[in-house]
Amino acid sequence: MTRRYSSRLIAVWLFALLACPPTKAGNAALTPTPPMGWNSWDSYGRTITEAQFKANADWMAAHLKRFGWQYMVIDEGWYVLNPESAPKDYKFLVNDSGQFLPVPSRFPPTANGAGFKPLADYVHSLGLKFGLHIIRGIPREAVAKNLAIEGSSYHAADAADRSDACPWNAYNYGVKSSEAGQAYYDSIAKLYASWNVDFIKADCIADHPYKPEEIRMLASAIKKTGRPMVLSLSPGPTALENASEVSKYAEMWRICDDFWDHWGPWEKHDWSQSLYQQFATAAKWAPHVAPGGWPDADMLPLGHLGPHPGDGVLRETRFTKDEQRTMMTLWSIFRSPLIIGGDLVSADEWTTSLLTNPEVIAVDQHSYENRAVITTDTVAVWLARGGDSGVYYRTDQGHYIAVFNIGDSEQTIHHDWKDLGLTEKSYKIRDLWERENLGNAQSLTVKLKPHASVLYLVQGKR
């Protein structure tokens, strides 16, 4: 190689490095793209059994895995002995080290002390990954009995902060920012690693209240195990001012309170995030999206929500088909993690089509510079570059444009390309949902029904 040729390569490499957006190098290898998977809460609440979980895992492996879906996550309550009772009457399975264990009556292979390892191994045999949900802190029962913390000289009472229980969940006390507190988090992370867990969703930690000390302790404990485990923080809304902090320790974090299947405000829960509200929230968080750290717009309540949804009655999603497609489009152009909430086994042809469109999934997994370029009370337009942007490289495959009618009446939306920051006079348009080419256009004009949307790939001259 000549010196001139070598210097040119170095110059190209430096340009590519400087041109790329910031990335979380410590976590980028674990989650270089937004995680995609399924969570049990929206359909099963605290009641899911091993048989039900396996059935959903089998369905994912058969129908979704080839499109990039991989995480199978058991949400809250796997340690609750009587999940269909009132929460005040719950009884828990806690071992002699003060750690929650899965209930054998719902997860039979755990009866011999194997914990979730047999189930995780089953999920892995399908080519998928296994995750579970925890509430921050230490079980109250462990503190009452002052159980020894495994691998340390401390006991539960040493670690517990009795003044800092989760205000909306009575299972645990908080954990002190101390050697004893760290020892407890070390013990549960070690346990989960021994079960071959790949994903931990930690709740009552990202907001109401925000617990940065416990986030740091949990992240440190996970790192000590040596096992790669995604850390997902919940609930939201994570405060924007905490973005740089949470991104140091977690791979994803919730940007809103619980998201359910309603376009506007929900009378039952005024705190529940609506799809309409999610547009403004996503726009604020878009600058913080980066490989290794993904603002999370919450689960996708699609299809059949049952038999025991985490909130409300058994139902088919309340979203219209237009709203379902709009939700998938917003999550994708924003690059949120994609975590399905509906029962997979019950998925119909329409729901399956939303989850298996490779061109839409590519927007979520392989785009960059994602941002809202036009926002009014009734219209939202998002723009992103098509291709990949990593630590040392960037590819350019045109632009993605998402146009949303977020108003309550039909409208025609028109913009010149320059309104969107695009410089060429004419662009070739491809409709990603319909998977068809629409030809060349000198401007953008879309007629949309209420709450409907389109997602386009636009390419200029090459």
Question: Which residue stretches match the model-derived regions?
Answer:
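Catalytic cores of secreted or luminal carbohydrate-active enzymes
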Residues: 326-375
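Aromatic-lined carbohydrate-binding/catalytic grooves of carbohydrate-active enzymes
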Residues: 61-122, 126-204
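Structural recognition of the beta-strand scaffold that forms the well-ordered cores
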Residues: 35-40, 70-75, 80, 129-134, ...
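Bacterial N-terminal signal peptides
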Residues: 10-19
